[in-house]
A protein has these predicted regions:
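Bacterial N-terminal signal peptides
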Residues: 11-25
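A short catalytic or substrate-binding loop motif that flags glycine-/basic-rich loops and adjacent residues
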Residues: 11, 106, 304
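N-terminal zymogen propeptides
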Residues: 26-183, 187, 201, 208, ...
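N-terminal secretory signal peptides that target proteins for export/translocation
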Residues: 1-12
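Extracellular protease catalytic domains of secreted zymogens
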Residues: 171, 175, 179-404
Length: 404
């Protein structure tokens, strides 16, 4: 099946009630065209950057209900406080309701680097406004790029960049933050940008790099895995928004922590009920090219001889972002990756590279009591969601900072 058709939900992992429309965007910073779908009664709007096209990486985010600017955070979307409450990163009220879960994380060390495409001229101002609104300490942000020429603005990537820096900072506000912008003119984040991000984090003493973009897997990816091997850096990537069986790289790399997507069910009062796999989104797959890494030997009955992913998962929909003077509701594994990266940074276990981090997390499966204390095992949302590791959500989502 054509991967472009599958990623639009017309094949193996359809969105409920999916329909396709191509029309002009009203979102002021969006691309000239977009696709829409409907899921659980919500309109899902994909910017041009999230529509896979041959020869370029794509983002993994979408707007929810509307891509029109709003004067305040959309009603009901998760906040840094509500997400941190559900994941037991902070103390919060019973049920972790969005409206009253206001305590936010306070940790972070070293540095977090975000790799995206194109310049984001209002990055510092937007991050400051977001942080102030939610009571998050101001960020120490540096915007940089490979080489000497500042990249142009890619309007459909601005939502991605806002999402990445705002939520990574929200989870680990004490970490130095870098936004590394690719200077490639075709909007692809380049390996030069990834290498720059890793070097900056390493010079800061260590930390994490988050990459919320990707492309279908190809055989030459084996030669790219070397870019994610810095022993002072743990690399994270989105597992994609296309459901199960749709591959994506760099999420497929055994040297990257691939982050899938979940969804919080809440009652009419906004209280948390449970967390489920986000049906039709939060991609997972067995890599056709990457062999099973040693840290997955314990789940070989599921992955066989292949690298299986995602490794972990985080809430997929929906979050608030602040962009160019306005608020938007947004979702996707583009949210999940920087969020989980920030959580791992704040956990401050300071693993010596991605493989060390993954080895630590997968080792939790051997101790059921420890595993239940440290991860939320997601077993609902699709028939493939099982007890323990699965291709829906990997090991599961965060439960406290332990084991990360």
């Amino acid at each position: 099946m054509n991967w472009f058709v599958r990623i639009l939900g017309l094949g193996a992992a359809p969105f409920v009630g999916f329909f396709l429309v191509l029309w002009g965007a009203c979102f002021p910073a969006a691309a000239q065209s977009r696709y829409e779908s409907v899921f659980n009664g919500h309109k899902i709007i994909y910017p041009q950057s999230s529509i896979p096209q041959p020869g370029r990486h794509h983002t993994n985010y979408f707007f929810v209900d509307s891509d029109a600017p709003q004067s305040s955070p959309p009603s009901g979307v998760e906040t840094p406080g509500s997400l941190a409450c559900v994941y037991k990163l902070v103390s919060g009220p019973t049920g972790c309701p969005v409206a009253t879960s206001t305590a936010v994380p306070t940790g972070g060390w070293g540095a977090i680097a975000i790799v995206d495409a194109g310049d984001y001229p209002t990055a510092a101002a937007d991050l400051a406004a977001f942080s102030s609104y939610y009571g998050i300490p101001p960020a120490d942000l540096t915007v940089t790029w490979p080489g000497t020429k500042k990249p142009p603005v890619y309007s459909d990537w601005l939502g991605e960049e806002a999402l990445d820096i705002e939520w990574a900072h929200a989870m680990a506000p004490n970490a130095k933050l870098y936004l590394v912008e690719s200077s490639q003119v075709n909007t692809d984040p380049t390996w030069a940008a990834v290498q720059l991000a890793a070097s900056l984090v390493a010079k800061a003493g260590g930390g994490v790099v988050s990459m919320s973009w990707g492309d279908p897997e190809v055989s030459q990816e084996l030669s790219w895995d070397k870019y994610f091997t810095n022993k002072k850096v743990v690399f994270f990537a989105a597992s994609g928004d296309s459901g199960l069986g749709v591959s994506i790289y760099p999420g497929a790399s055994p040297n990257v922590v691939a982050v899938g997507g979940t969804h919080f069910n809440r009652d009419s009062n906004g209280n948390f009920i449970n967390e489920v796999y986000y049906t039709g989104g939060g991609g997972g797959d067995l890599s056709p090219f990457e062999p099973r890494p040693s840290y997955q030997n314990g789940v070989s009955g599921i992955v066989g001889s292949h690298r299986g992913y995602p490794d972990v998962a985080s809430d997929f929909c929906c979050a608030a972002i602040y962009l160019q003077g306005a608020w938007y509701s947004i979702g996707g594994t583009s949210w999940a990756s920087p969020t989980f990266a920030g959580i791992v940074n704040a956990a401050a276990n300071k693993a010596k590279g991605s493989v060390a981090e993954l080895t630590m997390m997968y080792s939790e499966l051997a101790n059921p009591i420890e595993y239940a204390d440290d991860f939320n095992d997601i077993t609902q949302g699709a028939p493939q969601c099982k007890v323990g590791f699965d291709e829906c959500t990997g090991i599961g989502s965060a439960r406290t900072y332990a084991g990360k």
